[in-house]
Swiss-Prot record:
Gene giving rise to this polypeptide: nuoC
Source organism superkingdom: Bacteria
Acidic residues bias spans: 241-250
Name of the protein: NADH-quinone oxidoreductase subunit C
Annotated membrane topology: Peripheral membrane protein
Biological classification of the source: Bacteria, Pseudomonadati, Pseudomonadota, Alphaproteobacteria, Sphingomonadales
Family the entry assigns: Belongs to the complex I 30 kDa subunit family.
Gene Ontology terms, MF aspect: NADH dehydrogenase (ubiquinone) activity; NADH:ubiquinone reductase (non-electrogenic) activity; quinone binding
Role played: NDH-1 shuttles electrons from NADH, via FMN and iron-sulfur (Fe-S) centers, to quinones in the respiratory chain. The immediate electron acceptor for the enzyme in this species is believed to be ubiquinone. Couples the redox reaction to proton translocation (for every two electrons transferred, four hydrogen ions are translocated across the cytoplasmic membrane), and thus conserves the redox energy in a proton gradient.
Length: 250
């Protein structure tokens, strides 16, 4: 009789961080656990060796994602985050490195082929360079796009706009022209408001109104006097009866 094994349950983090930090040794710059995730920061130049160790010796077989984060105030403003999954242990771990605009991060396409597209995405959106990636082209933005749109200093409006020109009968690119500077408005979420509000974001009281506008009848809304008579007719309490043919069609 065949024995059916269920999928492994979500593994506990107990002891995992200590084991991995010990295995990675001097490569580790910092480690912590947050929101149930183990996060290990390592030296940038060691990222390939670190991920190879996690894949080959600790069963993190899959590279699920590579993400970028921008912290403009830091000397090395970018973080590159690698998210690994162990199928056999049903466990995840995140590994991070930091870099700046000019210093490349070693590619991990030597370990996972899918890293090629993931590294291209981080390059396209943040401008992070990956040494050894032989196809480091843009992957999400349009041809001829300038800049990296996920950087914190990239304007929300962008630099160019795309529209269809009736005169030229084609799509054209033009520099963004704003009649006034872009303004952003903070609105409180109906589910989770900010507590306390940001300075200057306090809500103002409504000004007093001496003669409030009220509507006594439909004509006050601009619908005209005939709207009063139509409203007075009302609607029948019961819907009109359908004949047999209409009932059959229904």
């Amino acid at each position: 009789m065949a024995v059916v094994h269920s999928a492994p349950k979500y593994a506990s983090n107990d002891g995992v961080r200590g084991t991995l930090v010990k295995a990675l040794g001097d490569y580790v710059a910092a480690s912590h656990e947050k929101y149930g995730e183990i996060i290990i920061t390592v030296e940038r130049d060691a990222i390939e060796d670190v991920l190879r160790t996690l894949r080959d010796d600790h069963d993190y077989q899959q590279l699920m994602e590579i993400a970028g984060v921008d912290y403009p105030e830091r000397p090395e403003r970018f973080e590159v985050v690698y998210m690994l999954l162990s199928l056999t242990k049903n466990h995840r771990v995140m590994v991070k490195v930091s870099t700046d605009e000019k210093t490349p991060v070693p590619t991990v396409t030597t370990l996972w082929p899918n890293a090629g597209w993931l590294e291209r995405e981080v390059f396209d959106l943040y401008g992070v360079l990956f040494d050894g990636n032989t196809d480091l082209r843009r992957i999400l933005t349009d041809y001829g796009f300038e800049g990296h749109p996920f950087r914190k200093d990239f304007p929300l409006t962008g630099y160019t706009e795309l529209r269809y020109s009736e005169e030229e009968q084609r799509v054209v690119y033009e520099p963004v022209e704003l009649a006034q500077d872009l303004r952003t408005f903070d609105f409180l979420s109906p589910w989770e408001g900010m507590t306390p509000p940001l300075p200057g974001d306090e809500k103002a009281d409504m000004p007093p109104i001496d003669d409030p506008m009220v509507t006594e009848g439909p004509e006050d809304t601009g619908a005209g006097a005939r709207a009063n008579a139509k409203a007075a007719e009302g609607t029948p309490a019961d819907p009109p009866a359908m004949d047999d043919e209409e009932e059959d069609d229904a």
